[in-house]
Amino acid sequence: MFIDRLIENIKSKKSPVVVGLDPRIEMTPQFIKDIAFKKRGENIEGVCEALYLFNKGIIDAVYDIVPAVKIQVAFYEAYGIEGFKAFFKTAEYAKSLGLMVIADVKRGDIQEVAKMYSKAYLQNQLFDAITVNPYMGEDTIMPYVEDAIKYDKGIFALVKTSNKGSKDIQDIKTTKGEYVYQSVARMINRISNSAIGKYGYSSIGAVVGATYPEEAKVLRKEMPNCFFLVPGYGAQGGTVEDIMDCFDENGFGAIINSSRSVIYAYQTPYWKDVYSEYEYAQAARAEVILMTGMINNGLVKRKYIAC
Ligand SMILES: O=c1ccn([C@@H]2O[C@H](COP(=O)(O)O)[C@@H](O)[C@H]2O)c(=O)[nH]1
């Protein structure tokens, strides 16, 4: 099952860190752009080649120390068909090195449309899991759940997102006296019963932001079946302490995504005097090792088992 494979990958890499491949052309090292533009021209094709080459460097540097990568489709979709090619090529390369691939596509929509989104991603062998948006209601996520079970894939449903504005709707109190995100959490946890693996977690998981540690603590209890995909670590302000309550005492229960803080580590105050732009991938590796060490130390301090 997807979730068992994910847990086994976390165990074998001894890391719950997911690297987010969200490349920006304006932050891409010049030497990569030079290579890409020379090969494909200083145009959309060249830009997309540069994004792919950048990702390839990161993947080469981290594939042996993380269980998965998360690829945010917006950074590719912005460039049309060439962007999509870079998106698929990135997924293909990550898979070829044994990484699990989460497509961050946050899909939703009415059932008939959701079926087509699901066909695009969950029926595609390149992707192990996708993110979905359940805020249109249960019927809209069932096509993804059905395909996840049928094709042995995973889904992570948005429950409490990491952005500031997540409170605008997700934190409204319902007539039952709970927050909207808790109602969504209850729905997802119930649905997730249909896909529980041998470690007690389901292939139907939840997105819970690192920037809301109190809410995450509540949700960990209210969603015992659901593995959390936790964005918001690093660049958005989430810290190791903030994510601790996403884990269970066996050191499972969560994968922690970091995109900018890892892929652009060489530009951060911590690493910028150590690594040049030519060494951006080594900097990303160093940041993942540091992040993994800090998370595992945090787990040990709590007397939880480290990953
Ligand atoms: O609640 C959410 C859900 C998804 N994301 C995604 O995670 C990364 C975060 O990038 P950073 O550079 O580490 O901030 C990005 O792909 C978002 O789409 C999120 O941030 N919050």
Curated annotation (Swiss-Prot):
Q: Where in the sequence is the active site? A: K106
Classification via CDD domains: OMP_decarboxylase_like (cd04725)
Q: What is its EC number?
A: 4.1.1.23
Q: Which UniProt keywords apply?
A: Decarboxylase, Lyase, Pyrimidine biosynthesis
GO biological processes: 'de novo' pyrimidine nucleobase biosynthetic process; 'de novo' UMP biosynthetic process
Please give the InterPro entries that the UniProt record associates with this protein: Aldolase_TIM, OMPdecase_type-2, OMPdeCOase_dom, RibuloseP-bd_barrel
Which protein, by its recorded name, is this? Orotidine 5'-phosphate decarboxylase
